[in-house]
Amino acid sequence: MASSSSSLAFSLSLLLALILCFSPTQSYKTIGKGYRLVSIEESPDGGFIGYLQVKQKNKIYGSDITTLRLFVKHETDSRLRVHITDAKQQRWEVPYNLLPREQPPQVGKVIGKSRKSPITVQEISGSELIFSYTTDPFTFAVKRRSNHETLFNTTSSLVFKDQYLEISTSLPKEASLYGLGENSQANGIKLVPNEPYTLYTEDVSAINLNTDLYGSHPMYMDLRNVGGKAYAHAVLLLNSNGMDVFYRGDSLTYKVIGGVFDFYFIAGPSPLNVVDQYTQLIGRPAPMPYWSLGFHQCRWGYHNLSVVEDVVDNYKKAKIPLDVIWNDDDHMDGHKDFTLNPVAYPRAKLLAFLDKIHKIGMKYIVINDPGIGVNASYGTFQRAMAADVFIKYEGKPFLAQVWPGPVYFPDFLNPKTVSWWGDEIKRFHDLVPIDGLWIDMNEVSNFCSGLCTIPEGKQCPSGEGPGWVCCLDCKNITKTRWDDPPYKINATGVVAPVGFKTIATSATHYNGVREYDAHSIYGFSETIATHKGLLNVQGKRPFILSRSTFVGSGQYAAHWTGDNQGTWQSLQVSISTMLNFGIFGVPMVGSDICGFYPQPTEELCNRWIEVGAFYPFSRDHANYYSPRQELYQWDTVADSARNALGMRYKILPFLYTLNYEAHMTGAPIARPLFFSFPEYTECYGNSRQFLLGSSFMISPVLEQGKTEVEALFPPGSWYHMFDMTQAVVSKNGKRVTLPAPLNFVNVHLYQNTILPTQQGGLISKDARTTPFSLVIAFPAGASEGYATGKLYLDEDELPEMKLGNGQSTYVDFYASVGNGTMKMWSQVKEGKFALSKGWVIEKVSVLGLRGAGQVSEIQINGSPMTKKIEVSSKEHTYVIGLEDEEENKSVMVEVRGLEMLVGKDFNMSWKMGIN
């Protein structure tokens, strides 16, 4: 469950850190004198292998590793890998079976002919990225061939010890950096100099700003404007060990407590190119079922099935869309995974309820935590013990405490665990036909710290007071260097011990892997096992929501941003967190709408649903101890929900097409403005607005008491989606103050776009059966223009999202205006599926046409229209208009009553009267 213990846990960690008197993380200007390159070899696979010798040993943070092996390879035209490890012994790396990628040559294997002692600067050139190096001391730089910019330049000494690795790069001050998460960034999406960015998965509430949270993504995007042209690149340090990354504006320093340096440099040069190339490496985002793009409702505290039934009924009565109803652990028997409470959720009644909602297209999802209750009569525990699947400490299962009380944690690096987990999912699915799984507390969260035993003679937990207070008998574990490493990362923002409120870092996984190394991939490994289990059981496209994430998690799961607050600041922060996860390759993301705790105000919940209706993953979720906050609880919030979610359900075909685009190219569903306008530097720090796709912009109210919003409009024409006669024309880009009364959100569509929509509905299944419309946006008042759009449709629960299976259709839409003629046409790939559904385009709305809007000689597929249709035109009004008054007149033309088949190529044209 989304743990309400988070704020308490954070306070306890702070107190413990103060009690134990942990000194602040030490900062050394220089640790040693680095390494020299003593030889370099060319390998048959096109890479280069070098050997580095330490120049001067020291004992700061441990002994230096004397000899290092350098491996450099241009893996693709746009990706360069730089891998540095111990030359003599294999070191921990992110497992290749979890994150498949090319493996460097084996350590110690000599390849090729050595070129001894080259003292001059050398270069290894690729298509776009150039690797250059010096030999004594060894440094390296990565440059872009096309504009000669240095992207990465190791200016200070390389440090490589068993438990401390350090490397730095210089940066131009004009660079804009994004990423290095998961982190709630109070200052927005753009990284702020002189803030430490700690990467180590923790159950720390997202209300705690600028600290390490649930996921670890050691990747950043660097966007620079060079001579008026934008260039973006990315740097990934693929390492699962805890690390601090210090960004000082003109430099960036990594301080890592284990593993290897495994750098990947991604060339770009556009932000979209970057995520395409990045997800080509880490895995394309998972395809999501259509229903998952609908609205979701959850709460910790739906005490029995009757409450859940009432929630579903009340959404229907309020005419607020709802696709998915969720259970936190209220459905469980004693908080135990894969169980059902026989009193609160009797199986027969639950099955009848699920049969009812499944028939109308609704879905049901429940929570699952990794901790398995230590209970001899509990079947899941019995089978786990028999299969020997738990993480060990000194040969015995490591004991912790979570909601069921004493628990053991499954080791998802063990193949036997994956099989056992899949079997438990099947058993539960046979018991309750769930439609997805929500995996929580998988950082891993533990209510205790250290080595614990179950107390004799007393119940744990006692059943009195909060369930998150540790009731085991525990003692600190500091006897090994894995529990007390020489360098203290800034864990939880207070330099807490790395094993605090989680698994002891000297515990062991399969094949002797230490928790110290594998800690931050626990949630990732659980996600992969859960995905495999659901796929095998359902045979459908899995839907998984995970709190903890790592590099590559987006290939399997969606993410929500954890335990946020019902505050205006949490609302603001939700946008930058969402945008960061799009860059990380996890595009299906959102925050708890209205906040997890405490109770939001009515005004805040109004404004939050106006933002959250456009999160890729849109869910209202609340804490056990907070008052009810379903969207129908306030009349004004219900109005805002019907308005904002009504728009979401109309654009579901567009969102689903973005889901397909994300799966094929990694493109985020929700994007910062600079993704579409990288040359417009005003966008670089904007975290108060966002785009869906390339051209659908949301400009919400984010402050209390405001009834207008100042929105940034990049250059071009923008049309309001709630009243398409309203337009903003921004020649060079400008900020515009727009009215935004309580139940109103500003949503604009950019020029040169064709947007497919449907009529909406209260459930996505119903909305999907309605006729299509196309909104075509040209530059306002243009006598010539061009627009494009896309539409992807399929049988949405098929495991794969692709063309070629006979159950999907892809359409490219085009439109042009010129010489007094408006034309639009489609090019359909594999139209059979769309034709089988009978989908038609019933209406076309064309925005920005120059003139009076007179329409004549409408033709479809080369023949005059004989069917009676309705044509109307309205003149645009401008919030900010064209500067040339003679061109200031433009119109919206709508043609209704069409029956153009989505699954068949068509062309349509008409003549226009121009005044």
Curated annotation (Swiss-Prot):
Glycans are attached at residues 153, 304, 375, 476, 490, 819, 888, 907. One of its GO terms (cellular component) is mitochondrion. It is an enzyme of class 3 (hydrolase). Coiled coil: none annotated. Expressed in roots, stems, leaves, flowers and siliques. Expressed in cell types undergoing cell wall modifications, including trichomes, vasculature, stomata, and elongating anther filaments. Not detected in pollen. The keyword Cell wall biogenesis/degradation applies. Belongs to the glycosyl hydrolase 31 family. Glycoside hydrolase releasing xylosyl residues from xyloglucan oligosaccharides at the non-reducing end. Has alpha-xylosidase activity against xylan oligosaccharides. Also has alpha-glucosidase activity against p-nitrophenyl-alpha-D-glucopyranoside. No activity against p-nitrophenyl-D-xyloside. This is Alpha-xylosidase 1. It comes from Arabidopsis thaliana.
